[in-house]
């Protein structure tokens, strides 16, 4: 016999959801600002801005948001540990799919086909990152997912990613970027908590002899493998948060999209004049 367990996603009250949303918002601001500069840049400069946008959206807005939210996830009586390989793999997936989506829409001038394809790839990848991150959780209770809620979370991820890429190609100016980032932050965190609603945990009842009693570890329980949140997540989250601060400073001090376009036009004009001279 197995019994469903109570899952607490808000162990620290509103603290972890608010911090998670803040990181989703900040990552979105940096990502949108980077995308606007990538639109105006060319060559190596465009690659650098696309890279920073991918790191900000995939690394900060999506991955850090997810694992800050997971710091508030507990199951009474169960020890939770994390697989370091799967956890880091989920970070790589988040950054990679964001890079694909941004590159598609920026290099193809935001065409409808590129937007839809990029949104599908990025959204599917973001949902995959979420469930890969959940697979990284090691605990004695058995994980099960409600397929209807999983599907809903994937739809939210694809729609949110498509909207994010649309914003990346359309918004100009800080007020518009902030407004778009508020919406994107809500979509990203909404997808996470919808995905968490799909999770159900079950454990052996007191009459079972499998070594784990619901809500109460027994002497026979095997400790799950992996690293604790303080050992793995905290250093990663802090490190990426510091990198986010650096990226925010870079964006604040960098030329605006308009200035980059004017600089590009000046270079093209100077090149044309030299060609005429010779």
Predicted regions span which residues?
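Peripheral, non-catalytic segments of secretory and membrane proteins
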Residues: 1-278
